[in-house]
Structure formats: C-alpha cells, structure tokens
C-alpha cells in the first residue's frame, strides 16, 4: 500500500525506525536530492536524438548519478548499507568528463552565462541550481551523517551540469549570452 496515513500530522519515518518532522533538515536534504533526480530525468528526456547521440558519456554519467542520489538520500535518513554509494572513481569520472568537455568544446570558464539557450541546456541549469541547494542541505546535516565522498560528489556534479549546459548549447548551435 502506498499510503499509510502515518504522515498526516507532519512527521515521517526514517529508515532506522525513528520518526522526524517533515520540516527536519534530513527531510529537506532528501527532498532536494529527489527534486534534483527528477530534473536530471527531465533533462535526459529533453535531449534531441541528434544531441543525445553525441552525449553518450554524459548520459551514462547522469544515469549513474541518479542512482547515487538515491544513495545519498538514504545516507541522510540513516538507511544502512544502501547500494550505489558515490566513490572516488565516480568523482574522477565527473572530473575526466569535464576535462574532456573543456578540451573538446573549448568550454573554459570565461565568465558567467545567462541560463537558457535550448530547452535541454536550460534544464541543465535548473538541475545545477537544485544541485547546489541539495549540496547545502546535505552539508547542514554534518559530515557525521553524510560521508565526505558524497559531499564532494555533489560539488563536482554542479560544475558538471554547468559545463553540460554549455556543451548542449554548443551542439545545438545555440548562442549563449554572457552576463
């Protein structure tokens, strides 16, 4: 059964059996991570087939990231031993992909861009902003609750999403507007 009625008065169950308020920092973190995950799914849906064909590495990273976000959410609510924990290799994969984007598409940082361009690039910007919020929310939980690798992963992910928005616009032939 999907509904239990146990949350009708502003509390919810954590994985360890503890109840907490729905306004608890842990639930704020889980909510931001869930929202980010949904926007990453939307981003993938908005890629044209032509652009998607040129983003195979990035798409695979996003799919891995979606699984990782569930794991970080589980960390936030004290779920034991959840699968898909972020690793140093996941962080390295983001970094290597960003390095390749900068090299192959000359996407070095030379000033801020106004979020927009094609729809998929704009969605990458939305996901980037939500990622920053999720990162702040997980930091509020403290390093005891969230392992350093997860916090570092979220930090790199927002940088990746910024570069991805730029690459999508470049592949779409959409001119970006500098601030």
Please place each PLM-identified region on the residue numbering:
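Phosphate/pyrophosphate-binding loop motifs in nucleotide- or prenyl diphosphate-using proteins
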Residues: 1-179
